[in-house]
Amino acid sequence: GRGAGAKPTGDRAPIATLARVAHHAIPRRYPRSVRLAILAAVLGLALTALDVGGCSGDPPWLVAGIHKIKHIIIIMQENRSFDSYFGTYPGADGIPARNGHFTVCLPDPRINGCDRPYHDPSLVNGGARHGADDAATDINFGKMDGFVRSAELERNRGCSATYPPPQVCLPSGPPDVMGYHDAREIPNYWTYAKNFVLNDHMFEPVASWSLPSHLYLVSGWSAHCKNAEPSSCTNYVGIKPEKSPDQSLGHRHGHHPDQGDRLSAAFWACVRAHGVEPKQIQRPTGLAARQRKAIGQCLAILTPAQRQRVLDHGAGGGGGEGLKLGTYSWTDLTYLLHAHDVSWAYYVQEGVQPDCDQNPDETAAGCAPVAQGASTPSIWSPLPAFTDVKANHQVHNVKNLSSFYRAAKHGTLPAVSWIAPTQSNSDHPPANIATGQAYVTNLINTIMRGPDWNSTVIFLAWDDWGGFYDHVVPPKVDSNGYGLRVPALVISPYARKGFIDHQVLSFDAYNKFIEDIFLGGARLDPHTDGRPDPRTDVREDAEVLGDLFADFNFNQKPRPPMLLPVHPPPGPASTP
């Protein structure tokens, strides 16, 4: 098999160098298929001369059958740890247990005792804070025992008796961060794992919240830029840019983000609790009488000045929908895709997202909803704010989700697709996880029904841990990460059946797979990609990073579609 982080050695070492040189030497005027064919021929001759052809260290683009993949789709959900979704999945590296009983018990300062993992039948969860400081608290220098303590802190923040609080603010009982789900609540996710590939060591790329994870997903880095010049960018993962997070060791730096306006946070939580969308504040037509009455009650929380701003400007007056992302001047993956004539699209479902812009360490309990859509740069859709996307006139490649359904139906999917949800189907607390599962199932069913299924790879993952317990210490690859472990699945007609991939992986592995499939191994490397930026490492080349090619058998007969019900019945219970 293909080992994690395998590097060319001995006679194969020059092959990797030759691959890079040949890749950049082939004129771009040739179509991509021709360039890859030339590259394969050159490397094939070199391998023959060295008598190492067919070794496991061969460049990925020489793997037999790789040409069968024409479409890579990344579906990104939100805020779940691996143990919270697959902690009791048979054969996976799940919650530690012995003789049918969990062996972990995390300190709980509320009771001066400890809390054990438990099956949580609730479809609506609270989670906990999930910023950089919270990751440090949860990891706690590798002890992985700070999750309950971190969640308990939230009980004293952003909670008000004037509206029904989310579960995270309830005054009694253990926080639900120790709860786990199984096939009883998420049967389709478990069915996909049973029939395709489950990655049980997929780590979020950075020990922080949603925005840095989504930036890594499309660019292999998270930074703060002073202007449009790549040289102005400095490392940034959700704490002060001048600080070095080193979160995988649990170091804290004394920086606590501004807690924001609690009255405003309480107002937005109040209207959300009554099922009112931000845009309906100014235009309440269609709302039930009880909802219109609730808006008036919620407005009473605010000061007169705040009330007027909300009535005048809607969600923007509350600090939520007026999200302004920074300028992202470093190089993202679409720059390489565009340079190699590889089509791409970033599909965004219109609606709202719950994460805060100025206050990333809050949960949904303390955030104003943030509007998102194809024309609105957002935390879950950052590409419109990248300067190279604008310079290449590629902003139109960020599309509404309806465009994805049409493309999948008619066989016109681009080579690379990313898909971002809206709040209600994202799995991000307090979203109903059955709603999220139905949304994901519908996406996958649509792909499977379409003409592109036999040439497609689907990667399904969750962007960060959301404050939920996980027992595996994240590997350290640089000062930013990795972050905590998240669920991940590989679905394809060429995916191995029922395979659990134990390799260390991160979202960098998705970029690496895209680069190997479509770009002949070109990397987001400031020394070779033609657009230098100050990033200090090439994440795709991390020694510990595994290889997603291990999840496939390109020689097998393409597997037929496996259409699942959007609203499945509960599956069987699992055991520790």
Where are the regions a protein language model picked out?
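N-terminal pro-sequences and low-complexity stem/linker regions of secreted or lumenal proteins
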Residues: C55-G275, I281-P576
